[in-house]
């Protein structure tokens, strides 16, 4: 037993009788502990070192013969923490020094004397409750190691109790440590000792309460079950989780619960389970904000994903796995050649090194010289290392955490300047890829938002993004299709961006794609005057309209009579009158000809007080207009100064915004057309227009004058001309959208299929926005015909045509008067066709065949065209309308199966909608593809892919576009429209078949694939070639010669 002695403290000499802390009398021990607390508060942090406190505590804890020594050592720790000396004690107890008492305190959890064990747990709890939360990372490794490896169940149970206290005292820090916590706790739940098992379960339940992700809160109990009972629960939990849409940030607590499930799920046998795991991994990884969050799980998760992608049989599931791999590689910054298991260790900040930095910085900022070994300074270095290693560079956190401990070493020194400089240095080292530009602080701020989020429905678009806009700047908003460019613009105008200035402070105007079709009858002037938001007088409005090309006559015209280009100019005129601070322009060059694009560039660059945000896929326009680029990528918004060329220097991988290069992994594929009856070369005309004139009903001006032209499989036509010159009208006549009304004739091959995408491409899907692309396709082609064809002018009967058909429906056969009911079937008749006709009130046995010319003469031309279309479908043009085939078709246009089958079209971006329209138009394997302004909503990557696909297409191509780069890269023939007149150049119009290569029989070509009723390909037996008499004689002669040589040879007859 230690000798009794009176407590004596001398702050001047730095002495204290430590033996008094370990005496048998508890009251005396308590009095000595209080005296020590008073002494150290007066003398400072180095007092513990001067009196040899740590050595004495460790010696007492290891004194197996003295219960009072062991109990007293634990009690004095609690007394110091409870009496205001905790901050002075921390640097000595929580450090990496060899003589720290903390390991000995943990070993005391297994003391045979219950009082000592209780005192030890109370002491550690007191330390944990009073210490700085960032010290948790110093204590945690020792606790987890004991839970995992200790042979004494009391130590395990006690450590688990301390962990529970840590979760209460330092929730954020323990959340960050969850990747280390969860595996240890999941293992401890299966301990053989029931006390440990019970404590581990309670600790795990408390730990998972740190998960604050709203997406998975309701699944936490299921996730815990899958950790504890993986064989039974993993498949169930994966099914539950696969239906979840992740929109909240995925942090360390969330991923530490989900990652073990994914790792185990990839070891399951069913392909469906593996696919679900890949979907979860992909969706979850997109919302991980830092590589450090996902790094602990990469060595196990990524190799399994790679193995799944290489071994799984289902190609669609393989593509999902590959997508997840790409996302994980990007988030974790894993090189292509690595599978994540051989990554170099992350840099680790060391406490002593940062303490050395503090010594230098204190001296630099006018402080007195201080030893690096000073406990307060050394401990500040340890805490700074914890902050750096967990990537916390928040100024408030650093300023509240470190100065109190630096003050222990330098009581009269203001350490804030030194702390801030070290913070800046470490933050710069950690964020080398997030360069700031020197002009960041120049100019007047219109908007400066930090840390905002943006989602569209269930899809996250921006996460913790920043946006700073300067007055007079022109920002080009760049990003891939579907990255959220138009959604961000809509969110700004609808006041849905948190922190964006309200309309009362900053006037913002959105120049939209198109003008509402419901206002088609309103005159242009009245439409502009009716807008109450415009700060302009009627005179100003008229003069502004004149300045953009609307003279007095045009101002009185209805909006419905305007072409796409003029509608866009009208929307821009309204934007000018709005006098906005911020102008949002979404594809402003759509439908504009070259002269109007130049006018727009001059107008935008002349604005000095107005800021513009521009979304455009016209790289030349952006290059000549913008002063900065806002890059929307990986859920962030990053500003780069300069135009598009300068931006590409900073971000080389964004070259696709500037150059029309086809990416190897991103290509479109157009289905090649089948053969047509009577068409033996690509030069033979399939579509003709002869002396056609046209004028819209109600219009005072004729649109087309005496147009003659023809189109064949070899045609590559660019239809050019200024806005309003009749380009779209010409194409509508060719495709049957409208019909000639001032004379002339349009002829097309009976079996010809045309794939048409209109100028306002979205009108094809406007009434189906709440359907998925799959549902839209199933609706459009449900009868085997294209239901959009049914609404074309050349399929709708006029009153005059109905009267003519009624008059011509009477047929006299064998003296009996019959009335034609329907056209039933068709067959070849010389150079034309004849049609089987049924009669009203008569059986099918009475049907007769009538030639095409006679039926046309009787007024049945549109009925003939209807049957021709049906027959064209039947003759092999039709494809099985099943989900797998539709998904594969859209995949050829860069649209994933996820969007085709599971996303409504309302939620798709403009570029994705264009891909749906293109895919739907080409489903029937058209012979001629007709595209009216196809480049409007496609990004550069998709545009390059479309150009390559059109070049390889075996059919004819007609393109209306103002994009010269696009037309020149494809087209060899030009139809120039000028005020309704056509000037054709570069064409090769022939009568008959022409002299080109024959396409009706190509050497080595197999017959076209035919399908049965279930959509399965029919494998035809190969025809055997019959031998001629000469061949038979030659074979016989050969057999005789071989027999003569002694070989055994038999013919089929002999066998």
Swiss-Prot record:
Pathway: Protein biosynthesis; polypeptide chain elongation. Its main location: cytoplasm. Residues 987-1006, 1024-1055 are annotated as: Disordered. It comes from the Eukaryota. SMART domains: AAA, CHROMO, TOG. The keyword Electron transport does not apply. It catalyses: ATP + H2O = ADP + phosphate + H(+). Keywords: ATP-binding, Cytoplasm, Elongation factor, Hydrolase, Nucleotide-binding, Protein biosynthesis, Repeat, RNA-binding. One of its GO terms (molecular function) is ATP hydrolysis activity. Its EC number is 3.6.4.-. InterPro entries: AAA+_ATPase, ABC_transporter-like_ATP-bd, ABC_transporter-like_CS, ABCF_EF3_subfamily, ARM-like, ARM-type_fold, Chromo/chromo_shadow_dom, eEF3_ABC2_chromodomain-like. ADP binds at residues 45, 723, 933, 936, 962. Residues 447-659, 687-1004 form the ABC transporter domain. GO terms for cellular component: cytosol. It is found in: Cytoplasm, Cytosol. HEAT repeats lie at residues 45-86, 96-133, 135-172, 175-213, 217-255, 257-290, 295-337. Residues 1033-1044 have a biased composition (Basic residues). Ribosome-dependent ATPase that functions in cytoplasmic translation elongation. Required for the ATP-dependent release of deacylated tRNA from the ribosomal E-site during protein biosynthesis. Stimulates the eEF1A-dependent binding of aminoacyl-tRNA to the ribosomal A-site, which has reduced affinity for tRNA as long as the E-site is occupied. Assists translation termination by stimulating the release of nascent protein from the ribosome by release factors. Appears to target calcium-channel protein CCH1 to the plasma membrane. Belongs to the ABC transporter superfamily. ABCF family. EF3 subfamily. Associates with ribosomes. This is Elongation factor 3. It comes from Cryptococcus neoformans var. neoformans serotype D (strain JEC21 / ATCC MYA-565). The lineage of its organism: Eukaryota, Fungi, Dikarya, Basidiomycota, Agaricomycotina. The gene is TEF3.
């Amino acid at each position: 037993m230690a000798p009794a002695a009176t407590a004596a403290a001398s702050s001047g000499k730095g002495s204290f009788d430590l033996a008094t802390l370990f005496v048998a009398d508890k009251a005396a021990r308590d009095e000595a502990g209080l005296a020590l607390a008073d002494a150290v508060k007066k003398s400072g942090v180095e007092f513990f070192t001067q009196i040899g406190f740590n050595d004495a505590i460790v010696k007492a804890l290891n004194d197996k013969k003295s219960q009072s020594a062991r109990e007293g050592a634990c009690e004095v720790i609690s007394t110091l923490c409870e009496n205001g000396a905790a901050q002075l004690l921390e640097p000595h107890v929580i450090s990496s020094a060899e003589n720290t008492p903390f390991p000995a305190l943990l070993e005391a959890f297994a003391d045979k004397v219950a009082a000592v064990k209780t005192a030890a747990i109370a002491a550690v709890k007191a330390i944990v409750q009073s210490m700085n939360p960032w010290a948790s990372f110093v204590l945690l490794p020792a606790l987890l190691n004991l839970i995992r490896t200790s042979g004494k169940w009391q130590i395990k149970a006690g450590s688990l109790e301390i962990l529970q206290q840590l979760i209460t005292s330092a929730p954020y820090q323990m959340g960050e440590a969850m990747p280390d916590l969860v595996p240890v706790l999941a293992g401890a739940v299966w301990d053989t000792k029931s006390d440990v098992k019970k404590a581990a379960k309670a600790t795990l339940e408390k730990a998972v309460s740190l998960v604050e992700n709203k997406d998975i809160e309701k699944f936490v109990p299921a996730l815990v079950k899958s950790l504890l009972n993986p064989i039974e629960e993993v498949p169930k939990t994966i099914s539950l989780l696969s239906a979840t849409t992740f929109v909240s940030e995925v942090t360390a607590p969330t991923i530490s619960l989900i990652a073990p499930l994914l790792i185990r799920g990839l070891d399951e046998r069913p392909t469906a389970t593996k696919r679900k795991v890949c979907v979860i991994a992909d969706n979850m990884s997109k919302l991980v904000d830092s590589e450090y969050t996902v790094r602990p799980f990469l060595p196990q998760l990524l190799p399994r994903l790679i193995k799944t992608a290489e071994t799984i049989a289902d190609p669609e599931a393989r593509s999902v796995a590959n997508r997840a791999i790409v996302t994980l590689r990007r988030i974790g910054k894993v090189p292509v050649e690595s599978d994540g298991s051989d990554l170099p260790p992350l840099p680790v900040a060391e406490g002593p090194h940062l303490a050395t930095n503090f010594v230098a910085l204190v001296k630099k900022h006018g402080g007195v010289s201080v030893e690096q070994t000073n406990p307060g300074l050394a401990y500040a270095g340890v805490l700074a290392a914890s902050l750096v290693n967990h990537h916390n560079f928040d100024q408030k956190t650093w300023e509240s955490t470190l100065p109190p401990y630096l003050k222990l070493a330098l009581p009269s020194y203001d350490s804030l300047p030194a702390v801030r400089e070290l913070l800046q240095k470490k933050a710069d080292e950690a964020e080398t890829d997030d360069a700031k530009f020197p002009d960041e602080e120049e100019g007047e701020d219109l908007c400066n938002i930090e840390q905002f989020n943006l989602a569209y429905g269930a899809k996250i678009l921006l996460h913790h993004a920043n946006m700073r806009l300067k007055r007079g700047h022109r920002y080009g908003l760049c990003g891939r299709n579907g990255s959220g460019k138009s959604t961000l613009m809509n969110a700004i105008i609808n006041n849905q961006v948190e922190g964006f200035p309200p309309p009362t402070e900053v006037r913002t105007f959105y120049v939209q794609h198109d003008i509402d079709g419901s206002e088609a009858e309103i005159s242009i002037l009245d439409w502009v005057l009716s807008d109450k938001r415009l700060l302009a007088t009627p005179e100003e409005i008229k003069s502004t309209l004149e300045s953009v090309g609307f003279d007095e006559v045009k101002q009185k015209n209805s909006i419905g009579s305007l072409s796409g280009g003029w509608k866009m100019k009208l929307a821009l005129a309204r934007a000018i009158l709005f006098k906005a601070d911020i102008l949002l322009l979404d594809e402003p060059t759509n439908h504009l000809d070259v002269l109007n694009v130049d006018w727009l560039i001059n107008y935008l660059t002349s604005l000095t007080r107005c800021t513009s945000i521009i979304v455009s896929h016209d790289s030349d326009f952006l290059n000549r207009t913008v002063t900065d680029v806002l890059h929307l990528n990986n859920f962030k918004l990053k500003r780069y100064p300069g135009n598009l060329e300068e931006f590409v220097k900073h971000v080389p991988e964004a070259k696709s915004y500037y150059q029309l290069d086809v990416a190897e992994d991103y290509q479109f594929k157009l289905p090649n057309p089948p053969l047509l009856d009577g068409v033996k070369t690509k030069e033979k005309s399939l579509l003709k227009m002869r002396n056609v004139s046209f004028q819209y009903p109600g219009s005072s001006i004729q649109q087309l004058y005496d147009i003659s032209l023809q189109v064949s499989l070899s045609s590559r036509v660019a239809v050019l001309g200024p806005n309003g010159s009749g380009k779209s009208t010409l194409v509508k006549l060719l495709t049957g959208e409208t019909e000639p009304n001032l004379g002339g004739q349009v002829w097309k091959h009976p079996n010809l299929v045309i794939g048409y995408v209109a100028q306002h491409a979205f009108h094809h899907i406007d009434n189906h926005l709440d359907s998925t692309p799959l549902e839209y396709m199933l609706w459009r082609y449900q009868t085997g015909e294209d239901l959009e064809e049914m609404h074309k002018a050349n399929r709708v009967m006029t009153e005059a045509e109905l009267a003519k058909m009624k008059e011509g429906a009477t047929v006299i056969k064998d003296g009996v008067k019959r009335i034609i009911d329907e056209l039933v079937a068709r067959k070849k008749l010389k150079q034309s066709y004849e049609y089987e006709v049924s009669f009203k009130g008569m059986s099918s046995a009475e049907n007769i065949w009538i030639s095409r010319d006679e039926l046309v003469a009787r007024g049945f031309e549109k009925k003939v065209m209807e049957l021709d279309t049906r027959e064209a479908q039947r003759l092999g043009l039709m494809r099985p309308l099943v989900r797998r085939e539709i998904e594969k078709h859209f995949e050829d246009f860069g649209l994933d199966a996820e969007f085709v089958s599971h996303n409504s079209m309302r939620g798709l971006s403009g570029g994705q909608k264009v891909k749906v329209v293109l895919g739907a138009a080409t489903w029937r394997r058209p012979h001629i593809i007709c595209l009216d302004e196809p480049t409007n909503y496609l990004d550069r990557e998709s545009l390059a892919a479309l150009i390559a696909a059109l070049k390889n297409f075996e059919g004819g191509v007609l393109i209306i576009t103002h994009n010269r780069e696009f037309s020149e890269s494809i087209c060899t023939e030009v139809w120039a429209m000028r005020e309704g007149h056509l000037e054709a150049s570069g064409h090769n119009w022939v009568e008959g078949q022409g002299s080109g290569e024959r396409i009706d029989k190509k050497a080595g070509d197999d017959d076209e694939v035919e399908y049965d009723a279930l959509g399965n390909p029919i494998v035809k037996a190969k025809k055997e070639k019959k031998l001629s008499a000469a061949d038979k004689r030659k074979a016989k002669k050969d057999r005789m010669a071989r027999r003569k040589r002694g070989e055994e040879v038999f013919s089929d007859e002999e066998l």
